[in-house]
Amino acid sequence: MKYILVTGGVISGIGKGIIASSIGTILKSCGLRVTAIKIDPYINIDAGTFSPYEHGEVFVLNDGGEVDLDLGNYERFLDINLYKDNNITTGKIYQHVINKERRGDYLGKTVQVVPHITDAIQDWVMNQAKVSVDGNKEDPQICVIELGGTIGDIEGMAFVEAFRQFQFKAKRENFYNIHVSLVPQPSATGEQKTKPTQNSVRALRGLGLSPDLIVCRSSTPIEMAVKEKISMFCHVNPEQVICIHDVSSIYRVPLLLEEQGVVKYFQERLDLPINDCSNNLLFKWKTMADRYERLQKICSIALVGKYTKLRDCYASVFKALEHSALAINHKLNLMYIDSIDLEPVTKAEDPVKFHEAWQKLCLADGILVPGGFGIRGTLGKLQAISWARTKKIPFLGICLGMQLAVIEFARNCLNLKDANSTEFDPNTPVPLVIDMPEHNPGDLGGTMRLGLRRTVFTTENSILKKLYGDVPYIEERHRHRYEVNPNLINQFENKDLCFVGEDVDGKRMEIIELTGHPYFIGVQFHPEFSSRPMKPSPPYLGLLLAATGTLNTHLQQMSKLSYSDIYSDASDDSFSEAKFAELDIN
């Protein structure tokens, strides 16, 4: 087993996750089996109870793990399915050690950070690195480990010490350290500064780790003189200093790394079994990156949500939309609308903001209402849903978005004016959305319906069923505490809003579709978590197809084409069979 540790310096949010994912992509393109581990040095057990404004979205895994959004990058780049234990937190490690101490596993010894915490970290990494993540049940050959935060943070000291020890346990030929640092370029001078990187590497070396590769993040390509200066002061060869400057899309990052010879250096330093890197995975990434830059037709989607001030709150939603837009040769114009800005209260307090929000909504080719929690902003979401339904604008509701679509239809089409969710009004006379029976209202952490669940289609006449390839059932990831009340489903009989997907027991409503509408779909699950750059999520793809007026054409072609891994390389949005390029990443 080979271990690649990715650390960061100077500032957080420098792009370690994308760089680590790109490293994994390059190695996978060489025929190697790659897994990934993300270390978050916070004391929380997992990311499940975080505010979206703290760390962005909570990414959900197949096994129900609520983890850092960087694991989403790993899954998308590497096309793998990780587990909750691939996300290590300080809280998990301490909980594990304390539980062992309570059981008496330490035989009365004084439990300390060194060696007990550091040993637990090393054992966790070694055990999880062996777990197969790509479906073929073969053990991974390489584990890419990202250490969150920056070198020098007090929260991460135990992890740095653990890896200082681990490099000797694993042996030099099996352990590799990549340090990602910032090379700022002040506008006043325009000169690229190396001092922050020098200090960061000095701090890293002072803690017992020496970088094998220094990745310099910069706004523009770094000059050779700057690279040589970093090489001299950081005790590495010039070829061990590479640059990742700002690029048009993240699809360029693996290509930048490959162009600078990292494969050859990995092969020599880690003695990797690489004979021929002719795998066409990187070629596909280049195809995607090139196409991304030449897209001209634009598709505008309005995202009506509660957490629009921080884009990372909807990171996977954005990626799923981007994957779908790229697949149909359109540039995505995602317009973020704070749902509360659509409400009358904003009209009274800030008319300009109110009219700007409604102008965005009116200009949108499609409308998306994602998941969320709490009553704030729900009126604005209901108004956006009503607009999409009545104006026949393509609409996709995710989780809460689906629940609100059912409520909006009940209020305005079934004359159930008091229809509501018990999340917003526990005493509502028409509880159309209710708390699930298994939900424990005492604690918030880990009390939701989480992870991969099966949804069975109940009709053959379903747009979404066709988009999924006419399969009898699908499996998607869930994260919710509330569900449509099964006792009130009879109210919708013979109405235009149809429940076309249910759970395996036929008790939970999973998918809704509105007949007579170009595309009005709601899903209780979160399909964005399963979207991949070369395998766009069907519900999101359907939204983009409907928004560009090509849904019917695409559905007609579905009988002739294999849905999985279809990737068009056409310069327009025509869906003729001859213009589809099959990009099989296996």
Swiss-Prot record:
Lineage per the UniProt record: Eukaryota, Metazoa, Chordata, Craniata, Vertebrata
UniProt keyword annotations, A-Z: ATP-binding, Glutamine amidotransferase, Ligase, Nucleotide-binding, Phosphoprotein, Pyrimidine biosynthesis
GO molecular function: ATP binding; CTP synthase activity; identical protein binding
Pathway where it operates: Pyrimidine metabolism; CTP biosynthesis via de novo pathway; CTP from UDP: step 2/2
Phosphoserine carried by residues: S568, S571, S574
Keyword Zinc assigned: no
Name of the molecule in the record: CTP synthase 2
InterPro entries reported for this sequence: Class_I_gatase-like, CTP_synthase, CTP_synthase_N, GATASE, GATase1_CTP_Synthase, P-loop_NTPase
Domain of life according to the entry: Eukaryota
GO cellular component: cytoophidium; cytoplasm
Family of the protein in this entry: Belongs to the CTP synthase family.
EC class (word): ligase
NCBIfam families tied to this protein: PRK05380.1, PyrG
Biological role: Catalyzes the ATP-dependent amination of UTP to CTP with either L-glutamine or ammonia as the source of nitrogen. Constitutes the rate-limiting enzyme in the synthesis of cytosine nucleotides.
EC number of this enzyme: 6.3.4.2
Reactions it catalyzes: UTP + L-glutamine + ATP + H2O = CTP + L-glutamate + ADP + phosphate + 2 H(+)
Gene behind this protein: Ctps2
Domain Glutamine amidotransferase type-1 residues, every copy: 300-554
Residues annotated as the enzyme's active site: C399 (for gatase activity), H526 (for gatase activity), E528 (for gatase activity)
